[in-house]
Amino acid sequence: MPAKRKPVLPALTITPSPAEGPGPGGSAEANLVDLQKKLEELELDEQQKKRLEAFLTQKAKVGELKDDDFERISELGAGNGGVVTKVQHKPSGLIMARKLIHLEIKPAIRNQIIRELQVLHECNSPYIVGFYGAFYSDGEISICMEHMDGGSLDQVLKEAKRIPEEILGKVSIAVLRGLAYLREKHQIMHRDVKPSNILVNSRGEIKLCDFGVSGQLIDSMANSFVGTRSYMSPERLQGTHYSVQSDIWSMGLSLVELSIGRYPIPPPDSKELEAIFGRPVVDGAEGESHSVSPWARPPGRPISGHGMDSRPAMAIFELLDYIVNEPPPKLPNGVFTQDFQEFVNKCLIKNPAERADLKMLMNHTFIKRSEVEEVDFAGWLCKTLRLNQPSTPTRAAV
């Protein structure tokens, strides 16, 4: 799909539920007219428009969320200070993902967090996970989101071992468009781009979740934040001013991880690369093989699935020191296209002023090529995760 073509959209038909009361800006109908205008500003294709319309129509029937209305189905994962479960919302019959965050905080702080999370109601994009609502109950904040049946890319990676470049092309497009939407339409940055915050589904959609919309929630969860710091940019780790350029570093680091099958710091040595790719892999301008890294493994990371990484675990401060002071990670030569290598290198420039920005990356050859490439993302995902593919086959939804 050409990036600049703006399709002519038929009017959105989102039916409000009779149970839905007037919003803060007036009647539900007036709110929907405003929403329709905002959606028509987005460059959506027909399929994206229909899916967003269907989600918003379903959401309009949900009404106020209450703890008693949910039936737990299974646990989806844990992280970022909360546990995510797959639930059914009994009044509507909808399947949702419910994130429970336990916080020992005063009522005023809790109410501020719930208020700040309401901004998520306005985040409607094919590249952002849908939001049903947030509420407080029994010492926990609940954030209810669209359920993505493919899970997160870190879960997909466990099954796939490595994710092919053409698939990562579609992932890169979705992440860039999601970041651009958050920045341009809501003036917010993500702050926590990593494989576990990129969700996918059997329809071929790729969406961002867990972005930093609530400053108060970020502050309240500061103590649980250490585990995500391995994706933070050098400037953020040093406590200096940071911007959306920091999200671009995190995306680049995530792409290297998804490409080679493990967190890329410290870099894999020649033996491990050979185990990963099944053949000797050379690197560097002179074509030298990867040298054996003297560095330990990063903290909390298992020994490589390829059995070659027997180094002791790296302490968290060693890892953060490495990110700030050592050369940035890169993709090995001879395995990936030059376009993809160059794209990743531009994301992982340590100086944020020299790092590529969103606009530059959207116009990069790797992205332009990936936009026109026919890739059956949904088919690949369903085969990898052994999911049932929806009856209507879809190409990558980006």
Swiss-Prot record:
InterPro entries: Kinase-like_dom_sf (IPR011009), MAP_kinase_kinase (IPR050915), Prot_kinase_dom (IPR000719), Protein_kinase_ATP_BS (IPR017441), Ser/Thr_kinase_AS (IPR008271). It catalyses: L-seryl-[protein] + ATP = O-phospho-L-seryl-[protein] + ADP + H(+); L-threonyl-[protein] + ATP = O-phospho-L-threonyl-[protein] + ADP + H(+); L-tyrosyl-[protein] + ATP = O-phospho-L-tyrosyl-[protein] + ADP + H(+). ATP binds at L76, G77, A78, G79, N80, G81, G82, V83, V84, K99. SUPFAM superfamilies: Protein kinase-like (PK-like). Residues 70-367 form the Protein kinase domain. It comes from Gallus gallus (Chicken). This is Dual specificity mitogen-activated protein kinase kinase 2. Activated by phosphorylation on Ser/Thr catalyzed by MAP kinase kinase kinases (RAF). GO terms for molecular function: ATP binding; MAP kinase kinase activity; protein serine kinase activity; protein serine/threonine kinase activity; protein tyrosine kinase activity. Disulfide bonds: none annotated. Belongs to the protein kinase superfamily. STE Ser/Thr protein kinase family. MAP kinase kinase subfamily. The active site is at D192 (proton acceptor). It comes from the Eukaryota. GO terms for biological process: MAPK cascade; regulation of early endosome to late endosome transport; regulation of Golgi inheritance; regulation of stress-activated MAPK cascade. The modification Phosphoserine is found at S220, S224. Residues 1-29 are annotated as: Disordered. Its EC number is 2.7.12.2. Catalyzes the concomitant phosphorylation of a threonine and a tyrosine residue in a Thr-Glu-Tyr sequence located in MAP kinases. Activates the ERK1 and ERK2 MAP kinases. Pfam families: Pkinase (PF00069). GO terms for cellular component: early endosome; focal adhesion; late endosome; mitochondrion. Keywords: ATP-binding, Kinase, Nucleotide-binding, Phosphoprotein, Serine/threonine-protein kinase, Transferase, Tyrosine-protein kinase. CDD domains: PKc_MEK2.
